[in-house]
Structures are given as C-alpha cells and as structure tokens.
C-alpha cells in the first residue's frame, strides 16, 4: 500500500461477532443467514446511525464500526445488546442470534474507506472476551466513559490476547446483570393475579409435519383467545403476550407468574387435507397440575364448532357464568368454507408482518375471502385495518381517501355482524383519525362491551381520551391494556405519553425508557423523551434525543405530527413541543 495514501487518526472501534454462528449455519444455513442480515439492517445499522458511527467492514458473521466518540461507541454497544436481547425474545435458544461486542480506543490507519492497525486488532480481540450478549471494553475506553454514561462496567482484570504483546486490561457489562442496568429502567414487577378466573392461551404446536402450516396453528390459537376474550367473567391475556412464548417450551408455572394468570391452555394442531385434530389441555399455573385434556377430530368446515367447544369446556371448568348476551352470541356459528378460513388466517399473518408488500398481499387474500363468503365480518374489519395502516404509514399510494374507505369497511363489518367487536374497534380508529373523537369514543366503548378483554380496544379508547385532553382517564385505560398485554411494548409508549401530559415526568421517563429497551428503533418514543427533557430543563439530553429521532427517521416532522395527531385542543401539542424550543432545538 502506498505510504502517501495512508492517514492516521484516533478512533473508538466497535467489533461485534455472532456467537456459535457455524453451528447455526450447519443447522439451517438459509434461515440463519437471512436472520443475521435482518438483524444488521433492522437493529445494528439504525443504532450505529443514531450514535454517529460508521460500519467500515463486514466479516461474514461480524462487523467493525468506527466512532469519533468513546461515549457514543459504548452507548451504541450497550443499546445493541439490549435490542438484540429483545429481538431474540420470541425465538428458541437454538435459533437466536447472540452477539459478543468489544470496544477499543486506539490509533488507526486509514486507507480509502477501510481501517487498519492495533486499534482495530485489539477491538477484535477484546470482543472475544465478552460474555455472549455482553460488552467488553479496553481500559482506555473506560477512562473516557467513566462518569459520562449510566452504564456500569465491572473490572475484569488483565488478559493475554493473541498477537498482542502486552496484556489487555478489560471491563465488562451484560444486560443480563440487573445490578448493572441503568437506573430508571429496571424490569417491571410480576403482575398480581386478578380476582376473576384468569387464563393465557399459549401458541398451539403445529403437528402437521409441514412447517409451512405453522400459520394455521397460530390462527386456531388466535381464534380461541378471541372467543375467550369475549367472556366478561374471565381475564384473558392478549395474543401479543401469549405469542412471546412461541417456539419455546416454557415452564408453565413461570408463564403463570410472568403473565399474572392462574390457568394456562396449551395444545397442538394437526391438519391433513380437510380434516383437523386439536389436542388441548388446561393447567393450573400455580401448582402445575392438569385440570383437563381433550381431543377434537373434525372436518375443517366445522372449525368454528371446535373452537366453540374448547371455549365452552374452559368456561364450564372454571365455573364462569355467562351473561344473557354472551349466551346468545355463543350459539353455533355453523360451518365455514375451508378455503375462506385458510385465507382469513393467512391474511392475519401477513398483516402482522407490517410492511407495504404484506399489506397488499393481505388485501388480496381478504377480497378472495369475501368472494367466497360475503358474510364474514372479520374480513371487512381486517380490510378496514389495512386501509388505515396504509394511510398512517403512507404505503401503497395511500391518500386521505383511505380514511373514508376504512370507515366504510368498518361499517360493513358492523352491518354484517353487529356482535363482531373488531368492526367497532376499527370504526373507532377510523373516526379518530378523521378527528371525530366523540363518535370514536362511542365505537370504542361498544368494542369493549363486546370484548371486555380487548387490550386493543382499551388502548384505542385511551388514545381517544388522551386526544380529548382527559389524560387521567387515558392513563387508567392504558394501564388496563398493559395488564392484559404485558409483553406489548407500545402500551408503555402510550402510558409514557399520558404521564408526560399529566406532568408526571419521572414516571413518564421510566415508561419511555422501558419501551426503548424493547423497541430500540422507535422515533416517536425518542421524540416524547426529547420533549420531556426539554420541559424539565435537561436540555443537553433533549438535544441528544432529538438527534437520535432524526437518526432513526431523517424525514421526521413536527409539522406533520401537528397535522396528523387529532388533538381536540391544538395547544396540547404546543405544550408538548415547547420544551424542544427551550432546549434550542430547531423544529
């Protein structure tokens, strides 16, 4: 290499490497590679951008990143490991991508866009000394960051490392060590058991012999959760939190403690041609004892009848008395066209992928469902959700006409079956975005009447009350939603917003920071944190979080928020952002 082309500078270097990557590749090469690339794109790259770093080399299962600031490098390393832990939460241990991360400060040589020298080499060696899921840093880095960050490192002594003459003094940190977590974001205490019978339905195992049929087992589970949720005498954990255990074999008593329920339903689904076999068993999570087990073997056209039987068995076993309205709604729903049901279930999975392409695919499937069975209210409601989601995210050429379309589809769902809660829920959402808050409030209240365990409906009503300026009521509704869906990070965001509006800044900060641990790419949560810090005089932190907002979403616009968020009193939005101005942020 030509001498004149080499420049030198001091830099902080972050080295990250996947633990046991060769073993993962041997097990499933395609899925492992796809997952790693997704983690780099969706987790690593946004965090590097937020912390003003630059990825300068990829090494198959690892990356090297340059930072101009030691503090930025260390905070990025910790945020990366916290985000990876959250991303791995729903994966079996033998499929999770776990990283080791090392950070070093040293002199580097620069040629074109690549970096060389001891500064880089030591970072790579230090990385190997980190615990899986943890961070190791050199003594030089520690001198710079000590007292400048909330992350507490443990002195791990001197280590001999390959090809480095002198022993290296390292310090280590792991998000698994609760004692080392930054203050204000400790884990939430486990929830208490409700007074009424409480249950969580874990994802049913797919026993069909075809992994591609996993969506069908998920659909059966979701339908059973939905049916149980409509029973006012039960407390039923929402789908998001139940599905946090998908692909795992958790201890039922641990699930019971984590979700705060007494009973847990688990089972399996086997589908062959147009036949279906469901095995289900209910367990007392406080003792681990089995209460009952049953097998259902039917034609696929009787799937609704099977789901009704499962629900009825649970209700009877727990001695829950149905109201007159619930008894009426429990009447047989008759047979279903197998193709229509299959498409309906697949469309739900597509919607959950939450991108423009999957939104288009879900819409196509739902239109086919309604061609087969125009009376399927859930399909109309799902189409309404898609129209709204496209509008909010500006997908698929969305325009304000999407709101009118969403409103019409929600009304069609209600006209088709007025007892279908999702129709009223989607009507509430559409009316909210159209700034018709009083009408939206009535629709959300009706959704809760029909589905008293719907975390989504409580969140919708809470959001409406928040926009109406009724923040105490909103907070109570968000808290109720979070109890029903304790693993869903967005409810923490909404709780934080209500607390911020109420001036309860310390509690709001805790909620927002807990949310960022679970959703590290959220621009909106960072925006509200920046507003909070501005209003409480912590102006440097406010400016820092505002920079992070733009790092995650360069097109973020406060003016767009003013136009889109339907606050009944526009001064509520002014009050939110005044702290940013006080911090010197140009908006």
From Swiss-Prot:
InterPro entries: A/G_cyclase, Nucleotide_cyclase, TPR-like_helical_dom_sf, TPR_rpt, Ycf3/AcsC/BcsC/TPR_MFPF
Keywords (A to Z) from UniProt: ATP-binding, cAMP biosynthesis, Lyase, Nucleotide-binding, Plasmid, Repeat, TPR repeat
Domain Guanylate cyclase: 12-127
UniProt keyword Repeat present: yes
Pfam families per the UniProt record, alphabetical: Guanylate_cyc, TPR_12, TPR_16
PROSITE patterns attached to this UniProt entry: GUANYLATE_CYCLASE_2, TPR, TPR_REGION
Catalytic activity field: ATP = 3',5'-cyclic AMP + diphosphate
EC number assigned by the record: 4.6.1.1
Keyword ATP-binding recorded: yes
Class of this enzyme: lyase
GO biological process terms on file: cAMP biosynthetic process; intracellular signal transduction
TPR repeat ranges per the UniProt record: 343-376, 421-454, 455-488, 490-522, 524-556
Gene Ontology MF annotations: adenylate cyclase activity; ATP binding
Protein family per UniProt: Belongs to the adenylyl cyclase class-3 family.
Protein name: Putative adenylate cyclase 3
């Amino acid at each position: 290499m030509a001498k004149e082309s080499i420049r030198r500078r001091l830099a902080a270097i972050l080295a990250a490497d996947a633990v046991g990557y060769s073993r993962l590749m041997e097990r499933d090469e395609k899925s492992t590679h796809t997952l790693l690339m997704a983690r780099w794109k969706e987790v690593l790259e946004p965090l590097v951008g937020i912390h003003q770093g630059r990825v300068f080399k990829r090494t198959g299962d690892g990356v090297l990143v340059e930072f101009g600031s030691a503090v930025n490098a260390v905070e990025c390393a910790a945020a990366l490991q916290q985000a990876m832990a959250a991303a791995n939460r729903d994966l079996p241990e033998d499929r999770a991508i776990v990283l080791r991360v090392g950070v070093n400060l040293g002199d580097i040589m620069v040629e074109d866009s690549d970096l060389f020298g001891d500064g880089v080499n030591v970072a790579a060696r230090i990385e190997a000394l980190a615990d899986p899921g943890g961070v190791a840093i050199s003594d030089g880095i520690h001198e710079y960051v000590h007292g400048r960050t909330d992350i507490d490192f443990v002195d791990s002594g001197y280590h001999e490392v390959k090809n480095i003459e002198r022993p290296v003094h390292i310090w280590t940190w792991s998000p698994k060590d609760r004692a080392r977590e930054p203050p204000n974001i400790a884990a939430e205490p486990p929830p208490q058991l409700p007074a009424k019978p409480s249950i969580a339905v874990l994802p049913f195992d797919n026993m069909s012999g075809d992994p591609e049929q996993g969506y069908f087992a998920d659909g059966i589970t979701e339908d059973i959760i939905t049916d149980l949720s409509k029973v006012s005498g039960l407390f039923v954990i929402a789908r998001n939190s139940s599905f946090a255990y998908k692909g795992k074999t958790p201890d039922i008593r641990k699930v019971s403690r984590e979700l705060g329920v007494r009973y847990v339903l688990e089972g399996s689904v086997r589908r062959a041609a147009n036949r279906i076999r469901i095995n289900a068993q209910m367990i007392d999570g406080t003792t681990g004892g089995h209460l009952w087990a049953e097998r259902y073997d039917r034609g696929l056209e009787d799937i609704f009848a099977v789901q009704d039987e499962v629900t009825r068995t649970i209700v009877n076993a727990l001695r829950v008395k149905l109201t007159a309205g619930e008894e009426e709604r429990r009447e047989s729903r008759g047979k279903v066209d197998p193709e229509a049901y299959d498409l309906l279930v697949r469309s739900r999975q597509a919607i959950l992928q939450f991108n423009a392409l999957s939104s288009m695919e879900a819409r196509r499937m739902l239109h086919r469902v309604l061609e087969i069975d125009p009376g399927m209210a859930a399909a109309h409601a799902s189409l309404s959700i898609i129209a709204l989601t496209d509008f909010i995210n500006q997908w698929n050429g969305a325009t304000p006409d999407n709101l009118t379309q969403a409103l019409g589809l929600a009304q069609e769902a209600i006209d088709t079956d007025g007892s279908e809660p999702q129709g009223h829920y989607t009507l509430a959402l559409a009316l909210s975005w159209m700034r018709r808050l009083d009408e939206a409030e009535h629709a959300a209240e009706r959704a809760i009447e029909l589905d008293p365990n719907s975390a989504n409906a409580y969140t919708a009503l809470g959001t409406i009350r928040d926009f109406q300026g009724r923040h105490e009521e909103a907070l109570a509704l968000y808290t109720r939603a979070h109890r029903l869906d304790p693993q869903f990070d967005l409810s923490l965001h909404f709780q934080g917003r209500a607390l911020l509006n109420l001036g309860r800044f310390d509690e709001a900060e805790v909620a927002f920071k807990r949310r960022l641990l679970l959703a590290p790419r959220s621009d909106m949560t960072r925006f509200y944190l920046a507003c909070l810090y501005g209003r409480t005089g912590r102006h440097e932190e406010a400016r820092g979080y505002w920079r992070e907002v733009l790092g995650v979403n360069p097109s973020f616009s406060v003016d767009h928020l003013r136009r889109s968020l339907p606050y009944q009193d526009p001064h509520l939005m002014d009050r939110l952002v005044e702290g940013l101005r006080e911090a010197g942020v140009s908006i």
